[in-house]
């Protein structure tokens, strides 16, 4: 039911496989921007390592090949733990832009980082200009 509704809203087929994801930028015009939100610790790790074992990671890889922006909206309980190194790698990766993020519960979950999803649209606007919306570190 959800997939049917998504197709109705977008007018496009839902991308469900890695093979489908590979074809998106090869058939016609490439996407202007790809938004991955929420970007979990697992997604960040795989992207930082160059893995493309899911449709969304393959889409990101295709975007990088076409020099197009990828916007990430972090949502991970381990952002200031083991995932911090992956965030660091991605912060310095060409064509990766972050929705500003911060600690959502510094005392209850001190390693948790979550994007300010209310800043998604301004982040996309800046990413299309090849700029990172600042400040990238925000107080929640």
Segments predicted by a language model, with ranges:
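A cross-family phosphate/adenosyl-ligand binding-site feature
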Residues: 1-54, 61-70, 77-140
